[in-house]
Amino acid sequence: MNTFSVSRLALALAFGVTLTACSSTPPDQRPSDQTAPGTSSRPILSAKEAQNFDAQHYFASLTPGAAAWNPSPITLPAQPDFVVGPAGTQGVTHTTIQAAVDAAIIKRTNKRQYIAVMPGEYQGTVYVPAAPGGITLYGTGEKPIDVKIGLSLDGGMSPADWRHDVNPRGKYMPGKPAWYMYDSCQSKRSDSIGVLCSAVFWSQNNGLQLQNLTIENTLGDSVDAGNHPAVALRTDGDQVQINNVNILGRQNTFFVTNSGVQNRLETNRQPRTLVTNSYIEGDVDIVSGRGAVVFDNTEFRVVNSRTQQEAYVFAPATLSNIYYGFLAVNSRFNAFGDGVAQLGRSLDVDANTNGQVVIRDSAINEGFNTAKPWADAVISNRPFAGNTGSVDDNDEIQRNLNDTNYNRMWEYNNRGVGSKVVAEAKK
């Protein structure tokens, strides 16, 4: 017997089985082939560099010596403080979410207030003001879609039209807790209300918790492919937790800001937000703003039914002297269309901005542009430039991850067709 021939046959058969197994494994389940330093169009972190980008770093305090925020899972009481649902239903304390929020704020307590929302559709805005204690708002249905908060608002609408849609029957009045929020928008003298006032759900509450519900700006595809900011959820507070929530819209679906009560971006605050087990949908600059936000086990879905030729997931407006902006880990990036969508771009609201984002340990599908995964900055039109650094004598990559001459948009250990690093032509 020719053992050599048998061995070769066995190896060939084994190799063939291996190839078959690999080819049948979906791309998003295969190991990542991203290697540092990547390219100037798609910079990739090394394992050593990636150690700097986890929740602990993003949730550090700007106050020297202060402990980092270490959020625990949201826990719900056996009996909430307030229940929102149909009139006459046993246990219901309020028929609108805003009325329940107002009642919780009026208590002026530093004790967390729990608001349970029964299944149903709740049309209209919800404003959660700053308060001594945190608010937990949660749906009691089996799924997030069972509780739906929605309204159609366009940042391009006039203040008069906005007042008509947002404040029917004196929902916001002087003396009510959220009046100052409403007044900061309704008193605008500009032609349009703007992105910051286009939010359906707006919170300035430190410690806000949202769970098991859906928030949607229903403007959707009723407008053209032009500039139509339409925020579903806006949060300004610190230590915000969002779990098992659908956030739906098109442009600027989820907007995080460090605005104070004057409703303006600030330079000395870094609000921190944790988003887990959630679903976020939109087309242009889906997640925007200024703050430290960690997304864990969250799906980002890009729809191109309105814009067709462009789509961006992240648009961070991180200050240049702040090292941490947005972090997505163990998440999924899905886009319709053939390589049109991009992972993000810096939202250059001023000369002190250099948006920061890291996508790591996540799956990116074929709907994303692999040749140019990151876009040029919005507003300033600053061309995207990733820092590939240099390699020292010990084969270690040397680069400043916060060099203001480069963008700060990074990836690490991602997989899927859309995660491919395309070689760049030598200049």
From Swiss-Prot:
<keyword id="KW-0998">Cell outer membrane</keyword>
<keyword id="KW-0564">Palmitate</keyword>
<comment type="function">
    <text>Putative thioesterase. Does not bind pectin, and has no pectinesterase activity.</text>
</comment>
<feature type="lipid moiety-binding region" description="N-palmitoyl cysteine">
    <location>
        <position position="22"/>
    </location>
</feature>
<feature type="region of interest" description="Disordered">
    <location>
        <begin position="23"/>
        <end position="42"/>
    </location>
</feature>
<dbReference type="GO" id="GO:0052689">
    <property type="term" value="F:carboxylic ester hydrolase activity"/>
</dbReference>
<feature type="disulfide bond">
    <location>
        <begin position="185"/>
        <end position="197"/>
    </location>
</feature>
<keyword id="KW-0732">Signal</keyword>
<keyword id="KW-1015">Disulfide bond</keyword>
<dbReference type="InterPro" id="IPR012334">
    <property type="entry name" value="Pectin_lyas_fold"/>
</dbReference>
<keyword id="KW-0449">Lipoprotein</keyword>
<keyword id="KW-0378">Hydrolase</keyword>
<feature type="active site" description="Nucleophile">
    <location>
        <position position="285"/>
    </location>
</feature>
<dbReference type="InterPro" id="IPR011050">
    <property type="entry name" value="Pectin_lyase_fold/virulence"/>
</dbReference>
<dbReference type="GO" id="GO:0030599">
    <property type="term" value="F:pectinesterase activity"/>
</dbReference>
<dbReference type="InterPro" id="IPR000070">
    <property type="entry name" value="Pectinesterase_cat"/>
</dbReference>
<dbReference type="InterPro" id="IPR033131">
    <property type="entry name" value="Pectinesterase_Asp_AS"/>
</dbReference>
<protein>
    <recommendedName>
        <fullName>Putative acyl-CoA thioester hydrolase YbhC</fullName>
        <ecNumber>3.1.2.-</ecNumber>
    </recommendedName>
</protein>
<comment type="similarity">
    <text>Belongs to the pectinesterase family.</text>
</comment>
<feature type="lipid moiety-binding region" description="S-diacylglycerol cysteine">
    <location>
        <position position="22"/>
    </location>
</feature>
<keyword id="KW-0063">Aspartyl esterase</keyword>
<feature type="binding site">
    <location>
        <position position="345"/>
    </location>
    <ligand>
        <name>substrate</name>
    </ligand>
</feature>
<dbReference type="GO" id="GO:0042545">
    <property type="term" value="P:cell wall modification"/>
</dbReference>
<feature type="signal peptide">
    <location>
        <begin position="1"/>
        <end position="21"/>
    </location>
</feature>
<dbReference type="GO" id="GO:0009279">
    <property type="term" value="C:cell outer membrane"/>
</dbReference>
<keyword id="KW-0472">Membrane</keyword>
<dbReference type="Pfam" id="PF01095">
    <property type="entry name" value="Pectinesterase"/>
</dbReference>
